């Protein structure tokens, strides 16, 4: 009998369009000899919509429901996703997706799910908190200043100019896929960048800009996490923003990255250390800066990296000999393993 994968996609965050792309890639890559796929769309307003079911590979003409094609007659209660024995694959990016909220809901439903748990998801989603945890783990990061809504912005800008040097990058603390990120070359640009970032979150991070290559490492596993050889994001734009990643395709990927064995070893070790420091489970992608001075800075941990056909994470594992369909199978098995352990602890 086939096992059911319940694919959750869409969501309320600014990254909902990325989620649809990831979900369509996953539904086409699943091993349908082993799995049946049932899909549920979470609308921009937060409603749950029961969408397609697939017992065999979908055709090229098959497309998942989006906010533009919603069939409101198929609206269901969020708990309608429950199916005994099914594993949930929450292909949700950003807030209300990979920040622990959906993970908590799935734990209340007593359902296994792919990826990190409540704590590690919420921790990694918040850039400021992640930085503080990684500092305690002894992992190098670029200098930064944290700004919280209600702070004296003028005083904080003065702190930025005292501790950092232009250019700086301003980021919402609780967002991903480069949404709301700006590069600032002077104080006026910084003020505008802060206004943009505060549209997406009440906590904002200002980081020192560095002249660096962007190198990424894939992580797979629970308590025995394994890492990939690094890959490099090769950019044709000023910085790797949302449009460059998902709309304009102005990036290419060099897998494996052309870096020395010593640098590879440090990045893989730091990635695995960071994953353990946050209590990661299932998967993550760890992003590094490798500066022209030879410095290695950990930039962020992404607990639900993109799964589009051009995304770095599946390509990194493909380079390690694990195909896209096999990667999905391993993630499902890891989800069941972590679920069994979580349930065993409830005694």
UniProtKB/Swiss-Prot annotation:
Keywords: ATP-binding, Cell shape, Cell wall biogenesis/degradation, Cytoplasm, Ligase, Magnesium, Manganese, Metal-binding, Nucleotide-binding, Peptidoglycan synthesis. It is found in: Cytoplasm. Pathway: Cell wall biogenesis; peptidoglycan biosynthesis. GO terms for cellular component: cytosol. Its EC number is 6.3.2.4. InterPro entries: ATP-grasp (IPR011761), ATP_grasp_subdomain_1 (IPR013815), D-Ala_lig_Van_CS (IPR000291), D_ala_D_ala (IPR005905), Dala_Dala_lig_C (IPR011095), Dala_Dala_lig_N (IPR011127), PreATP-grasp_dom_sf (IPR016185). Mg(2+) 2 binds at residues 300, 302. GO terms for molecular function: ATP binding; D-alanine-D-alanine ligase activity; metal ion binding. ATP binds at residues 161-216. One of its GO terms (biological process) is regulation of cell shape. Binds 2 magnesium or manganese ions per subunit. It holds the Pfam family Dala_Dala_lig_C. It catalyses: 2 D-alanine + ATP = D-alanyl-D-alanine + ADP + phosphate + H(+). The keyword Oxidoreductase does not apply. It is an enzyme of class 6 (ligase). Its cofactor is Mg(2+); Mn(2+). Mg(2+) 1 binds at residues 287, 300. Residues 131-333 form the ATP-grasp domain. Cell wall formation. Belongs to the D-alanine--D-alanine ligase family. HAMAP family: Dala_Dala_lig. This is D-alanine--D-alanine ligase. It comes from Streptococcus pneumoniae (strain ATCC 700669 / Spain 23F-1).
């Amino acid at each position: 009998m086939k096992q059911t994968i319940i694919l959750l996609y869409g969501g309320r965050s600014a990254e909902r369009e990325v989620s649809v792309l990831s979900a369509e890639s996953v539904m086409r890559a699943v091993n349908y000899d082993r799995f049946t796929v049932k899909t549920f769309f979470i609308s921009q307003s937060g409603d749950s919509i029961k969408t397609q079911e697939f017992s065999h590979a979908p055709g090229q003409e098959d497309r998942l429901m989006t906010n533009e094609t919603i069939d409101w007659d198929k609206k269901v209660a969020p708990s309608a996703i429950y199916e005994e024995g099914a594993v949930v694959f929450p292909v949700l990016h950003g807030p209300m997706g990979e920040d622990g909220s959906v993970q908590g809901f799935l734990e209340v439903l007593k359902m296994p799910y792919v990826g990190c748990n409540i704590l590690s998801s919420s921790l990694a989603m918040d850039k400021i908190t992640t930085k503080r945890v990684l500092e305690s783990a002894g992992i190098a990061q670029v200098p930064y200043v944290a700004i919280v809504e209600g702070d004296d912005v003028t005083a904080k800008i003065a702190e930025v100019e005292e501790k950092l040097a232009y250019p700086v990058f301003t980021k919402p603390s609780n967002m991903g896929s480069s949404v709301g990120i700006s590069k600032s070359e002077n104080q006026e640009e910084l003020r505008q960048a802060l206004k943009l970032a505060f549209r997406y979150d009440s906590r904002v991070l200002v980081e020192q800009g560095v002249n660096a290559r962007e190198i990424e490492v894939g992580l797979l596993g629970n308590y025995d996490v394994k890492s990939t050889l690094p890959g490099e994001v090769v950019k044709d734009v000023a910085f790797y923003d949302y449009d460059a990643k998902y709309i304009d395709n102005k990036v290419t990927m060099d897998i494996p990255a052309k870096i020395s064995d010593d640098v590879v070893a440090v990045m893989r070790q730091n990635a695995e250390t960071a994953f353990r420091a946050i209590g990661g489970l299932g998967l993550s992608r760890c992003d590094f800066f490798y500066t022209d001075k030879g410095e290695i800075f950990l930039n962020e941990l992404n607990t639900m990296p993109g799964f589009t056909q051009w995304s770095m994470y599946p390509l990194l594992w493909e380079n390690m000999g694990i195909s896209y369909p096999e990667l999905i199978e391993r993630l499902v098995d890891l989800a069941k393993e972590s679920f069994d352990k979580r349930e065993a602890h409830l005694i």
